[in-house]
Amino acid sequence: MLYLTEEHCIGGRRKMTDLQECRNEIDRIDSEIVRLFERRMKVSEDVAEYKIHTGKQVLDPVRERDKLKVLRAQAHSEFNARGVQELFQQVMAISRKRQYQLLTEEGVDEPRDYHMTDSLPLNDVTVVFQGVEGAYSYAAMRAYFPDEIRNYHVKTFRDAMEEVSAGRADYAVLPIENSTQGIVTDIYDLLTEYQLYIVGEQVVKADHVLLGIPGSSVAEIRTVYSHPQALAQCRKYLEAHPGWETVKAANTAASAKMVKEEGDPSRAAIASREAGEFYGLAVLGENLCHNGQNVTRFIIVSSRPVYEKNAEKVSVCFELPHESGTLYNMLSHMIYNGLNMTKIESRPIPGKTWQYRFFVDFLGNLEEPAVKNALRGLEAEADSMRVLGNYGRQEED
């Protein structure tokens, strides 16, 4: 028979205990814990009812901190004290989540600026994009909006946000992430700076080609222009031509425009096929990306806080107390409510050394109870939280 040298306290004495006997006792204790947990949750629901009728906040950090201090003091070792604290932090978090659910079930909604609409107004609107005609932002705009729109371009992402904020444009089209180069950090920072809202997204495949003036050839090329990300995405192709000088440009379409204006057969641009057609350039090389699934996701930004009734993706950002476990606690609101988180990013908070703002995307609609529960918890327990948008999701081709 298998024995363990576990300490089993009976009448103050220690003795060798059979493993199965230990397991049986643990099972009895666990069953008692479940019974007491459900009893505690019932009392927690009574607390929620009181808070519903009085308007008292669910989270009471002073009460929880004092309670944890008392519980820790009841443990008989430092190891157990830490365990008690972790255990009851989770118990309290679950209790709060149940209270958030009850608030939603009782129809106690958090005030939000957002308004639901059957569909976004896309006709007879003005759209701004960063870059020039032929850029991937231009392609994203043409894919998302009908032909009957007014559009114009600006030099920078900030300029595009400013145009929408000032009311000169109804929407802006902005790149937010690329499948090979990652996020566009400037866009994340601007989303927190401007009170604008994500109302849609568009995925565009970045099919880079080498463009030159008509009649030129690859053998004549000495200089290649493009955006730094495009140059990085075509690194292996460029390494196969060590004699070429690479020059950074504001964007891919701007590099194509530059080659067209210079009219020099020794100069080429890495840009889209559409940019080549727009500027009358010849395709000298194809399939330049070393990653065949090179796609860019663009967001559609508006000054109006609206979402379509069939919207299925939510974007939020939040800041946290600089304390252990706070990020886990925030993400647990999505996990507990069965929400599928599709993305998480972080950006440094200006003026707060080593502190970060988090950006999270998850699937859902602002009308869904699970989403309301999660947002209620995030808003109550983060230092600050903002819903950036609720919009339709586009899958990659």
What is each of the regions a protein language model found here?
Residues 2-4, 10-397:
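Domain-level signature for soluble enzymes in the chorismate/prephenate branch of the shikimate pathway
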